[in-house]
Amino acid sequence: MDAEMAAPALAAAHLLDSPMRPQVSRYYSKKRGSSHSRNGKDDANHDESKNQSPGLPLSRQSLSSSATHTYHTGGFYEIDHEKLPPKSPIHLKSIRVVKVSGYTSLDVTVSFPSLLALRSFFSSSPRSCTGPELDERFVMSSNHAARILRRRVAEEELAGDVMHQDSFWLVKPCLYDFSASSPHDVLTPSPPPATAQAKAPAASSCLLDTLKCDGAGWGVRRRVRYIGRHHDASKEASAASLDGYNTEVSVQEEQQQRLRLRLRLRQRREQEDNKSTSNGKRKREEAESSMDKSRAARKKKAKTYKSPKKVEKRRVVEAKDGDPRRGKDRWSAERYAAAERSLLDIMRSHGACFGAPVMRQALREEARKHIGDTGLLDHLLKHMAGRVPEGSADRFRRRHNADGAMEYWLEPAELAEVRRLAGVSDPYWVPPPGWKPGDDVSAVAGDLLVKKKVEELAEEVDGVKRHIEQLSSNLVQLEKETKSEAERSYSSRKEKYQKLMKANEKLEKQVLSMKDMYEHLVQKKGKLKKEVLSLKDKYKLVLEKNDKLEEQMASLSSSFLSLKEQLLLPRNGDNLNMERERVEVTLGKQEGLVPGEPLYVDGGDRISQQADATVVQVGEKRTARKSSFRICKPQGTFMWPHMASGTSMAISGGGSSSCPVASGPEQLPRSSSCPSIGPGGLPPSSRAPAEVVVASPLDEHVAFRGGFNTPPSASSTNAAAAAKLPPLPSPTSPLQTRALFAAGFTVPALHNFSGLTLRHVDSSSPSSAPCGAREKMVTLFDGDCRGISVVGTELALATPSYC
């Protein structure tokens, strides 16, 4: 094979001086099939082919039967230089590691630095951290890559400054001196060899100079001898070409041997045919032979200075047992194996087996998608019958069917041995089911075996039928049971449903009734709301009336006060003297009374006697007596007496008892009640009890100056306080009442209201009575009884009651 270089020396020098960056070179490794002509010589056009395009069909690529390897893109791999193909770049012979830049199922692309890139990298002082520029690429087949890429360089080995060392990139870094190299050395070609004796050292020095100068000086094609892997090289050839190259190859020895053989044949023929030839003829033959020898010597001498012609080469591929190529080397073994593997996969995918074969046309159309070479495909379809692909347990079989079409299928590889051991001559015989080694293979035995199998199958079918009948009977029984259960469950669920429907109806009725009740309540609520609004309006009216009544009561109280002042103030002095006299008379009379006995009034009523009190009885002689009972109620109720009843009054005490007392002109009435109304009385609507509590004149002045005082409870009078009370004139007294009525005094008209109470409490002096208050009475006119009653100095207004 020829080894081609990338570019001549001038091209390398131009790339070195060019400011533009050189394009990345690509090299392709492809095995070329040796097509022999009829005369046995090689086609010279194949030797002149250089870089091939990578886009070749599958049939043109070198394939391998091994499994597809997985490569890491961007990883560094060590290469095995012994497995490099002959057409690999010369730069790659000195490179230790390469980088996988891409791979497919057919080829692998590796990148590596050229010697120019290494020289520029190691000569630069600030070296790049990423290493030299990988400006060279080599595309190899996946089969070659599996052999060449020995191992992957681990990432731990790439740590540090390992990539800055020349021993990492080069196999023998001692052969290269990058520091001493210069661009001038690149332009200087190596001197040509002068003599034949100096060829070997000149060639070695030229090789070293070429490696240093990155291919400079390589413009001449040289012929080398390539020994294939299928033949064992001789010891001399292996010693002469340790690296695969032989710079000197002489063809003269072969030519001389051929000439010698020809001469010997001629001599033998001449000796046999022309034994009686003359001496002159012998001389001519000797002269011719000598001339041939001299001519051959001259040719040999001339050929030592000329470039040798192409040596006839012939690739011989060893044929294995059963190889359909029969020693022919039209296609490589790798392509054969790949094509066979493709056919095997296709037939397996179609399920081709005995009894279900695949037709030739369908198999060929499917195989054309994977095998581009139709010649190889047709060759395999014709000669692959009976072959077992490498690494497979199936054998290719083919034959013509009854219609004359070719059909293909796969059978186990050990079936041929089974036929041989069984002694079957039929190449398409397949053991029947249940056949064992040693069984009879005759047709009768086969029929008996088939009959036996049929009987067994019939028994099994009968058993299956019985089982099916049993299952059907069980199924019928289960259907009956399930039907009865379903009916019972249906009836129970129907009853429950009816109950639920009834309950639902009841609930609906209740809901409707509740809805009616709710509507009724809503109506009532509206009515109540209206009533509340009306009551609210009435309440407002009542409040307004109450305000008016309070104003009326205030005006009435002011009129009573003015009346009191008119009655009491002009006679303060006379009243004091009369009171002293009455007290003295009363004390003198009470000394003769026996304590502890009950006292009676003129009317016969019994008065409860107290241990420490005296009874004051007012007779016709108007003598004041000491009272022997205590007033326990906080206040007294006095009614206006009738004018026609005279001076008779009813005294109400703490026990709510009344006794009539004959009032004289000088008698002081304590309490009076008039159940009847005279003909000249007030109207019934104005009749109301009035409570009047009268204090002493001094207290009255103090009370009127300081304002009205309404204590929570009225006080009762004791004996000492009663003695101090001044006697008031009787209603029939000519001294007071007559003058009062004669003077034209008129009682103001009372309004239509109830609950009027006039009180006055003596708060100037402490009271020793049980009720804690001292009261003094004054007589006023009673509107209902047309008489005069005892009236106090304070008017208490009670809340009116509305009917």
UniProtKB/Swiss-Prot annotation:
Give Gene Ontology CC terms: chromosome; nucleus
- Where does the record place Basic residues bias? 296-313
**For the region Disordered, what residue ranges are annotated?**
21-64, 264-333, 651-688
> Which locations, inside or outside the cell, does it occupy?
Nucleus; Chromosome
Task: List, as start-end ranges, the regions of compositional bias called Basic and acidic residues.
Answer: 39-50, 283-295, 314-333
Q: What is its main location?
A: nucleus
Q: Is the keyword tRNA processing assigned to this protein? A: no
Query: What is this protein called in UniProt?
Result: Protein AMEIOTIC 1 homolog
Its biological purpose is as follows: Plays a fundamental role in building the proper chromosome structure at the beginning of meiosis in male meiocytes. Required for the transition from leptotene to zygotene in meiocytes. Required for homologous chromosome pairing.
What InterPro entries does the database record attribute to this sequence?
A: DYAD/AMEIOTIC1
> Any one Gene Ontology biological process term?
chromosome segregation
Chain intervals with Polar residues compositional bias:
51-64
* Keyword Transport set for record: no
Q: Which residues form a coiled coil?
A: 450-567
- Tell me what organism the protein belongs to: Oryza sativa subsp. japonica (Rice)
Q: Could you tell me the keywords of this UniProt record?
A: Cell cycle, Cell division, Chromosome, Chromosome partition, Coiled coil, Meiosis, Nucleus
